[in-house]
């Protein structure tokens, strides 16, 4: 498709890693590149997502949705095409009928926008702050660097979610747990205890 790939906070660790099409997150914690990629598109393809914040979804373009749970189809947005099925198997079947798109101008436009967003975010980590006033963006970027490639992060609702969304990077092995749908408070410790399996927990 040569299309930008946008993900939710919940899907960050699974979708972001080594993905040349990714242009950042959508939602309240998302990036302009993610938002505009969806709203400036001709068609939005939603894969296995029950993203609950419909205010961030476009309402004036065609939307196709694939989900293994039929009750999710059209629940968050007006869907023009809804397919019930396993996302991986559905995509594999549909690829055989797809004509490859060679025009990548829209993708390149959003990737350029995303590079600007990442540059702006990185600027916050360059200033460590002062004694007893360490900047949280710097702290989170250091946590990202020091954590193992297979770390499991738990984030509480609030600013830790913001910093985690922006500065913890996917490696293909990392996971992140949080109250992504309901925004429940003070859940990170219980998530951590529930995940005590010998993994590197942060």
What are the functions of these language-model segments?
Residues 32, 36-39, 89-92, 137-141, ...:
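Short, contiguous clusters of charged residues that form electrostatic/catalytic patches at enzyme active sites
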Residues 1-68, 171-189:
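Glycine-rich, anion-gripping cofactor-binding loops and their flanking helix/strand elements
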Residues 190-197:
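Conserved small/polar residues in nucleotide/adenosyl-binding loops
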Residues 1-20, 112-184:
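Cofactor-pocket helix-loop regions in the catalytic cores of large enzyme subunits
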Residues 60-157:
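Phosphate/pyrophosphate-binding active-site segments
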Residues 53-55, 73, 92, 163:
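Glycine/Thr-rich phosphate-binding loops of Rossmann-like dinucleotide-binding domains
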């Amino acid at each position: 498709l040569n299309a930008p790939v946008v993900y939710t906070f919940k899907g960050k660790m699974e979708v972001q890693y080594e993905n040349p099409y990714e242009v950042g997150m959508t939602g309240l914690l998302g990036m302009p590149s993610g938002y505009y990629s969806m709203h400036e598109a001709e068609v939005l393809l939603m894969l296995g997502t029950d993203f609950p914040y419909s205010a961030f979804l476009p309402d004036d373009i065609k939307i196709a949705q694939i989900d293994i749970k039929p009750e999710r189809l059209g629940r968050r947005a007006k869907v023009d095409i809804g397919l019930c099925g396993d996302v991986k198997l559905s995509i594999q079947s549909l690829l055989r009928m797809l004509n490859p798109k060679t025009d990548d101008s829209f993708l390149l436009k959003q990737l350029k926008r995303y590079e600007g967003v990442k540059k702006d975010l990185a600027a916050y980590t360059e200033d460590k702050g002062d004694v007893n006033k360490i900047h949280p963006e710097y702290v989170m970027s250091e946590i990202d660097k020091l954590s193992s490639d297979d770390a499991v992060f738990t984030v509480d609702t609030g600013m830790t979610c913001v910093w985690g969304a922006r500065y913890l990077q996917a490696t293909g092995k990392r996971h992140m747990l949080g109250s992504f749908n309901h925004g429940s408070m003070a859940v990170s410790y219980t998530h951590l205890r529930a995940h005590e399996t010998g993994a590197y927990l942060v």
